Structure formats: C-alpha cells, structure tokens
Amino acid sequence: MEKACKEPEEQPQSPPKADEERPSVEPSPEKSSPEEQSSEEVSSEEEFFPDELLPELLPEMLESEERPPQERLSRKDLFEARPPMEQPPCGVGKHKLEEGSFKERLARSRPQFRGDIHGRNLSNEEMIKVAEEMEEMKRVRNKLMVMHWKARRNRPYPI
C-alpha cells in the first residue's frame, strides 16, 4: 500500500522534466508563425483574467490589436495599467450590505433613507408622503429589531 501511494507522487515530477527538454526541441519564437504565438498567449491570458473583468477591458484590447505588433500591448499589460476598481462588478464578491452582523447591516442601511429627501425638489405633499414612508420603514425596522432581539434572548443555548 505504501509503495502504491509513493508511485503517484513520483509521476507528477516526471512531466516537468519533459517540459524542460521541450523548449530546446521547439524552434525559437522568432521562427514560429504569429498564429501559433497568439494561440499560446490566448491560453495563458484566459487563465490570467477572470471572465467578469473582460467586458471592461474589451475596448482597450481592441485598440491594442489594431496597432502594429511592435506597439501592441499584451492583455496583461493592459490589465495592470488600469486603476483598481472601487467596487467589484456585479456577481463578484459579496454585496456590501450582506457583510457583518445584523446591527452593522442595519446601521449601514440607514443613510440611504436619511438622504432620500434632501437631494430632491419636492412639493409639500410629496415631502409629507416621503416622510410618512420613511417613518413606516423606521417602524418596520424597529419591529424587526425587537423580534430579532427576542428570538436571540429566548433561545435555550447561545448562538
């Protein structure tokens, strides 16, 4: 059994040796056709870029492909030259309100409602309507907080 376990460990070490020998057998990159180079670059670039980020880089990649080969930038260089994103694209990572405890999420949601009225030009009737909606949201929020507090307090064992 021990010999059988050791054999698979030794096998993955042998392919890198074959890879080390391969570059000497292949022709130099200058002699190989540009189509072969592009297919090799594409495979390595697909591994480098997550699928979610590609739509943002598409216009810059198309511009770079139109240039002559000497001036053309690789996709990795384009990606590194861009400033980091402030927020991840949709579907990547958690939504900012999903992180943290219940009270932290509740505290983060409040500024959204607080600033809702101030940036608008509303008539008195509209302002009263929006204020009533906000009060109703506050009541519902407080009710949920009390229910959450009671549920946590009445458990036989702490969470």
Swiss-Prot record:
Residues 37-54 have a biased composition (Acidic residues). Keywords: Nucleus, Transcription, Transcription regulation. Its main location: nucleus. Residues 17-34, 64-80, 95-119 have a biased composition (Basic and acidic residues). The keyword ATP-binding does not apply. It is found in: Nucleus. Residues 1-120 are annotated as: Disordered. It comes from the Eukaryota. InterPro entries: TF_A-like/BEX (IPR021156). GO terms for cellular component: nucleus. The keyword Transcription applies. Pfam families: BEX. Belongs to the TFS-II family. TFA subfamily. May be involved in transcriptional regulation. Modulates various viral and cellular promoters in a promoter context-dependent manner. Does not bind DNA directly. This is Transcription elongation factor A protein-like 1. It comes from Bos taurus.
